[in-house]
A protein has these predicted regions:
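A detector of single, family-specific signature residues
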Residues: 1-226
Length: 226
């Protein structure tokens, strides 16, 4: 679109409107699905939850890194005992505690609000028949199910089930010219959040044992014996 408009000698609003109308007439652009209000609200819940989660993890990593400079190693602790472990390390160093305490307060608030959003997410999934059905698939949890529900939005807009993979950006790119014909990696043109959830679900399926002789981290064919 921009290349066509720049090709015009005279740049005016009338010429721009005429150029855009001509491009629409050619038929190179496809209509875009506008998500429903419910889908947009679900996406907002998922993005806000992810934002709080990433900020809380960033604070944890920052505290681990800065305390390591002073010779303190936090070690392997869960989210519930993280603050107690930090307080234990700096309780006898007042000048260091003054610098660390603000981050602990912010982390505490982030974790509290993250829990509220997560419980809200679980309540929505619990009352949604489609999400409960999706969770019967191995590796699919509440977050993946709700992300899929919000991304697909209106299933009737897909003529075939194979088209869903293209919307997620999980189909292979194609390059063909003369005798050259090869398929590249996935296009990654679709929804980034859904694609990330799909990869997590795939790793969860590959990481579990599927009967005798199966090793963790190796995917088995659905029709394989055993």
């Amino acid at each position: 679109m921009q290349a066509l408009l720049k090709a015009q000698i005279n740049k005016t609003d009338r010429n721009d409107a005429r150029g855009m109308a001509q491009m629409m007439r050619v038929g190179l652009y496809r209509p875009v699905h506008v998500k429903t209000q419910r889908s947009q609200k679900l996406r907002m819940l998922l993005t806000h939850r992810k934002l709080l989660q990433s900020k809380a993890i960033a604070i944890d990593n920052d505290l681990r890194g800065t305390l390591r400079n002073f010779g303190f190693k936090v070690g392997t602790v869960g989210a519930a005992r993280f603050e107690a472990r930090i307080t234990e390390l700096i309780e006898n160093i007042p000048d260091l505690a003054v610098l660390v305490e603000p981050l602990l307060v912010v982390r505490r608030v982030l974790r509290e609000q993250l829990g509220i959003l997560h419980h809200r997410l679980l309540a929505i999934v619990r009352n949604d028949d489609v999400c409960r059905r999706l969770m019967t698939v191995p590796g699919v949890g509440p977050v993946v199910a709700l992300t899929y529900r919000a991304t697909v939005d209106v299933p009737a807009r897909f003529r075939k089930s194979k088209a869903v993979g293209a919307v997620f950006g999980l189909t292979c790119s194609k390059y063909q010219s003369g005798e050259i014909d090869w398929s590249g990696r996935i296009s990654r043109c679709g929804d980034e959040m859904m694609r990330a959830c799909s990869m997590k679900q795939l790793r969860a399926c590959c990481g579990r044992r599927n009967g005798a002789g199966s090793k963790p981290g190796r995917c088995r064919s659905p029709g394989a014996a055993g």
